Design a protein with these regions (language model features):
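Cys-dependent protein tyrosine phosphatase-like superfamily
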Residues: 18-113, 128-171
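Bacterial N-terminal signal peptides
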Residues: 5-15
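Basic, ligand-binding patches in group-transfer machinery
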Residues: 2
Length: 171
């Protein structure tokens, strides 16, 4: 019995350690497709893991003052990753920031890309816009995927995304 308990404990420790040593341990991590993955704030060691997974660019939607952004940028560049910071205020995203996001994500040289903010709520809103305007999703389908990305409990971001789509969608 003691042997079984010990083995179970070791298995649990292995599972916890293994999960912390993968990109899956990034908050709200989602491998959307072979070109994009999304998530919340990565740790610096996650950047190395993302590079090993084939990521070529990091797109950070946080403010420079949020969670050691300068260290993240330096680490990304040290690893040879392209690094883009679009400083989106959580409560006040701007159309120009979405325009820049779309330009960056449209460039195939910036793919595969990992797109993040703190909890992936801003990412969800910007991703929803991209899915409708670039990938031909319906607003409803894009919204469902954006919720999986992290756009939850943020009605102002959802409203912003819908208004941006309405203004820019070809009739």
């Amino acid at each position: 019995m003691k042997l079984i308990s010990t083995l179970l404990a070791l298995f649990f420790v292995f599972q916890v350690t293994q999960s912390q040593d993968s990109v899956q341990s990034i908050r709200n991590y989602l491998h959307v497709n072979d070109q994009f993955c999304t998530g919340g704030q990565p740790r610096l060691e996650h950047l190395e893991m993302l590079k090993k997974e084939g990521v070529k660019a990091i797109i950070n939607l946080r403010q420079p003052s949020e969670h050691r952004a300068a260290e993240e940028e330096a680490k990304a560049k040290e690893l040879g990753l392209r690094y883009f910071n679009i400083p989106v205020v959580f409560t006040d995203p701007k159309d120009e920031q979405v325009d820049e996001f779309l330009r960056i994500t449209d460039d195939v040289n910036n793919r595969p890309a990992f797109i993040h903010c703190t909890a992936a709520k801003r990412v969800g809103a910007f991703w929803m816009i991209r899915r409708v305007l670039r990938d031909g999703f319906t607003v409803e389908a894009a919204e469902k995927e954006a919720e999986r990305v992290g756009l939850v409990e943020s009605p102002h971001l959802n409203e912003f995304a819908r208004k941006y789509i309405e203004k820019h969608q070809k009739k």
